Amino acid sequence: MDAKADLLSMTIEELENLMAEMGEQKFRAKQIFQWTNKGIKDIDAMTNLSKDLREKLKERAYINRLEVIKKFVSKIDGTIKYLFKLNDGNIIESVLMQYLHGYSACISSQVGCKMGCKFCASTGVGFVRNLTPGEMLDQILTIQNDTKNRIGNVVIMGIGEPLDNYENVVKFLRLVNHKDGINLGARHISVSTCGLVPEILRLAEEKIPVTLSISLHAPNDEIREKIMPINKRYSIDKIIEACKIYTETTNRRITFEYAMIDGLNDSKENALELAKRIRGMLCHVNLIPVNTVSDTGFKRSSREKITAFKEILERFGVETTVRRELGSDINAACGQLRRNLVENGQLVY
């Protein structure tokens, strides 16, 4: 017998095919889709389905269920960091952030990461597997059900490289954007990447106008290769060229994420070099005071250096912001909670 299907990972079209195989009417697919996207975890809770259909459905399918292992709530601004256990026992993280315009969730796309970025805690214990579309969607549903707050923005910027899990991430984008599901507009979704050029170009053709966030973190290849091994495959010039094609195709502004690391990439000369490379592009730069990860040796730039860097970029017409620091009293780099649990067998926070 084939393995059971996760209803949360299925499109309405896939559910329609399942209903046809089961000898059921097509409209049942939409009902099931609406139930799963409300966060229902029990097929028996689908009260507009007959008991007979529910029993048959349980033989063929299940609903993905995340378990909240731990959550940390900021006393300063209400930011919540979640540690989730997956069905197979693997661990991922998500974060809920509150802004003036509403709630934003930062979700994971993989268990671990292959990319090896030196300043990131996610890559420290290696790559395990990709997340399914349902596991990505369930992060949003579980947070919404836990907090009773509707999430208005999603950033796929947690553990993992989203474009390394391309097919599942794109399917997730279509699921979360569906009018009969969460119905989150594509313009309220950001997809982060360290710069997988072929996948950036593929994403441009998907006709899902999400915001693309590039983890750039350096003004030149020499510095970037020290902290991001992916740069040996895809240089900054190649990434920028792909970004220009993305903006031309989608008419969406690119965000360049830039972690400010003391003494490495934060000089006035670095700012000038970056400004000259990207001026005139439909883009904006988000400066990030780097998180401290115990074994990297990296320290965040001073406030004065960050301000000077920002002013130089703006002088060249590059729109620039400094990421607002949320949850500073529960501060941990993305992936740090999972890493502590995997390496030490306990939560060290």
Swiss-Prot record:
Keywords: 4Fe-4S, Cytoplasm, Disulfide bond, Iron, Iron-sulfur, Metal-binding, Methyltransferase, rRNA processing, S-adenosyl-L-methionine, Transferase, tRNA processing. GO terms for biological process: rRNA base methylation; tRNA methylation. One of its GO terms (molecular function) is rRNA (adenine(2503)-C2-)-methyltransferase activity. Coiled coil: none annotated. Binds 1 [4Fe-4S] cluster. The cluster is coordinated with 3 cysteines and an exchangeable S-adenosyl-L-methionine. It catalyses: adenosine(2503) in 23S rRNA + 2 reduced [2Fe-2S]-[ferredoxin] + 2 S-adenosyl-L-methionine = 2-methyladenosine(2503) in 23S rRNA + 5'-deoxyadenosine + L-methionine + 2 oxidized [2Fe-2S]-[ferredoxin] + S-adenosyl-L-homocysteine; adenosine(37) in tRNA + 2 reduced [2Fe-2S]-[ferredoxin] + 2 S-adenosyl-L-methionine = 2-methyladenosine(37) in tRNA + 5'-deoxyadenosine + L-methionine + 2 oxidized [2Fe-2S]-[ferredoxin] + S-adenosyl-L-homocysteine. Pfam families: Radical_SAM (PF04055), RlmN_N (PF21016). S-adenosyl-L-methionine binds at G160, E161, S192, S215, L216, H217, N291. Disulfide bonds join C106-C334. Signal peptide: none annotated. GO terms for cellular component: cytoplasm. It is found in: Cytoplasm. InterPro entries: Aldolase_TIM (IPR013785), Elp3/MiaA/NifB-like_rSAM (IPR006638), Methyltransferase_A (IPR040072), RlmN_N (IPR048641), RNA_MTrfase_RlmN (IPR027492), rRNA_lsu_MTrfase_RlmN/Cfr (IPR004383), rSAM (IPR007197). [4Fe-4S] cluster binds at C113, C117, C120. The keyword Metal-binding applies. Reaction proceeds by a ping-pong mechanism involving intermediate methylation of a conserved cysteine residue. This is Probable dual-specificity RNA methyltransferase RlmN. It comes from Acetivibrio thermocellus (strain ATCC 27405 / DSM 1237 / JCM 9322 / NBRC 103400 / NCIMB 10682 / NRRL B-4536 / VPI 7372) (Clostridium thermocellum). The gene is rlmN.
